[in-house]
């Protein structure tokens, strides 16, 4: 077994490609790949605090976008249940938790470095916003869990209630869009 593994080791990527061609994924099995922006947080950048702060801001923006997407999927699933979107909310929550851990740790290291007043303000702002994005993701998860529970119990809203939920949902999405745009600038 060891010899066979060693012989086939260089062909790993080719074998994976062959396997996926032989047994393709169905649409339900396909999972959207989410790049991990926390890879931008290299400890070597801590020697250049201004650059490290810029990288943190970029990761914060990606975290905001993930929270926004999670909230949109959750809101949509309340009135029009979609198992794929609900699963994505759970995945996004895990990813956002990962971002919070990585970014929080990096910001703690960065806050011990000599920072300009502007960079110090940015780091402080990132700490606050990071918690807000994580909280938004938690609320999205709660909505997704409610949607799952309603689906399992075969409960639905009246047409009037659905209409009101769609109106409120669109308003929340617009507020989130404006918030993410404001955070970016």
Where are the predicted features?
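Cytosolic, long alpha-helical scaffolding segments
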Residues: 2-185
């Amino acid at each position: 077994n060891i010899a066979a593994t060693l012989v086939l080791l260089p062909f790993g990527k080719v074998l994976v490609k062959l396997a996926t061609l032989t047994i393709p994924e169905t649409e339900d099995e396909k999972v959207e790949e989410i790049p991990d922006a926390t890879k931008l947080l290299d400890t070597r950048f801590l020697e250049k605090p201004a650059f490290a702060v810029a990288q943190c801001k970029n990761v914060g923006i990606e975290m905001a976008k993930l929270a926004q997407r999670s909230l949109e999927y959750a809101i949509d699933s309340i009135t029009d249940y979609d198992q794929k979107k609900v699963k994505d909310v759970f995945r996004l929550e895990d990813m956002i938790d990962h971002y919070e851990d990585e970014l929080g740790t990096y910001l703690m290291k960065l806050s011990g470095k000599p920072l300009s007043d502007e960079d110090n303000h940015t780091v402080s702002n990132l700490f606050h916003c990071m918690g807000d994005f994580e909280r938004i993701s938690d609320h999205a998860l709660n909505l997704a869990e409610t949607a799952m529970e309603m689906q399992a119990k075969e409960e639905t809203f009246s047409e009037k209630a659905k209409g009101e939920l769609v109106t409120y949902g669109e308003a929340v999405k617009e507020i989130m869009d404006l918030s993410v745009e404001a955070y970016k600038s």
